[in-house]
């Protein structure tokens, strides 16, 4: 809700959960870009459930299928908003980051202007941190 910190974050990466992206100001002068990390629902839901539980939200008690449906609709809504606002957004599959970090680093670097150290970006990926692995369905696609 308070995005007054955003101008000070210029030139930095900031992790923001998808549900909070619509709260970012729609001011083109800020010039921010979004790298939207995509993961299969089955990998995302356990952490979503934990977060909802910590916040005391009712969604923590929903059955997996219902929570998945709610989360999928939230992601679709966020993507529609980003597309409508014409915020530059690059969709990146988490699995691709783990499987081929150099290729993903090159894509992200190109998207962000080409001034980043791709080798350092690729080396920073630690496949051992890939928790909650699943072979499930990915998040809904970005709108064209």
Regions picked out by a protein language model, each given a short descriptive name:
Residues 1-14:
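Conserved substrate/cofactor phosphate-moiety recognition/catalytic segment
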């Amino acid at each position: 809700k308070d995005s007054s910190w955003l101008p000070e974050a210029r030139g930095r990466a900031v992790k923001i959960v998808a549900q909070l992206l619509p709260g970012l100001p729609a001011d083109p002068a800020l010039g921010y870009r979004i790298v939207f990390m995509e993961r299969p629902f089955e990998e995302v839901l356990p952490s979503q459930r934990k977060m909802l539980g910590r916040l005391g939200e009712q969604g923590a008690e929903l059955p997996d299928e219902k929570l998945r449906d709610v989360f999928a609709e939230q992601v679709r809504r966020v993507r529609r908003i980003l597309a409508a606002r014409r915020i530059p957004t690059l969709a990146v599959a988490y699995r691709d980051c783990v499987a081929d970090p150099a290729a993903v680093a090159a894509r992200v670097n190109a998207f962000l202007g080409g001034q980043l150290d791709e080798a350092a970006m690729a080396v920073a990926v630690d496949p051992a941190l890939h928790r909650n692995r699943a072979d499930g369905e990915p998040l809904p696609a970005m709108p064209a």
